């Protein structure tokens, strides 16, 4: 049952709105920073090695541990941490919109979980980042955490590849080939992150932030800001 729930959470049809966002890709395509298969795959690989998605995975695991130990104060701590590391309004709103949507949907799926979800919400406040909400789901439904974060990364990668297929544009087979070729890096990323201490968390995302900022003045957009 837990495995099926995980597949539901990371499915592209799960109504969180992830498909609405390009995470800076629209400007990078227009400026020729990511305009063909090789540069796009390199950009995704750099995200997995150095980007904020690594920190998100580590925080998902920390949320699972915090709920298991009853340390609910950690929810607010890590939610605030994520808020402070989102360098543009667009990226911050994306994470919060998806997180709030996930918490609401979890309560709609299983009314028996609403008291626990409500207790988590009290600690977090009105704005819940997606990594926090995902960690809560993994903890409350007792999903194996290693498989969960593999799914988290695979879902993130699939959504951005879908955006790249539309924007660059790429063929569907090219997009699937990118996902296939980056799967070993997903595994490597998870294996590295599970051993990280808090002081080791980092992200080098200034390029992403600059691209995201340029979305505000970009003439033509397909995705949400």
Swiss-Prot record:
Subcellular location per the Swiss-Prot or TrEMBL entry: Cytoplasm
GO cellular component: cytoplasm
UniProt keyword list: Chaperone, Cytoplasm, Nickel insertion
Gene3D superfamilies assigned: Urease accessory protein UreF
A Gene Ontology molecular function term of the record: nickel cation binding
InterPro entries: UreF, UreF_sf
Key word Cytoplasm present: yes
HAMAP family for this protein: UreF (MF_01385)
Known partners and oligomeric status: UreD, UreF and UreG form a complex that acts as a GTP-hydrolysis-dependent molecular chaperone, activating the urease apoprotein by helping to assemble the nickel containing metallocenter of UreC. The UreE protein probably delivers the nickel.
Family: Belongs to the UreF family.
Function: Required for maturation of urease via the functional incorporation of the urease nickel metallocenter.
The protein, known as: Urease accessory protein UreF
Gene from which the chain derives: ureF
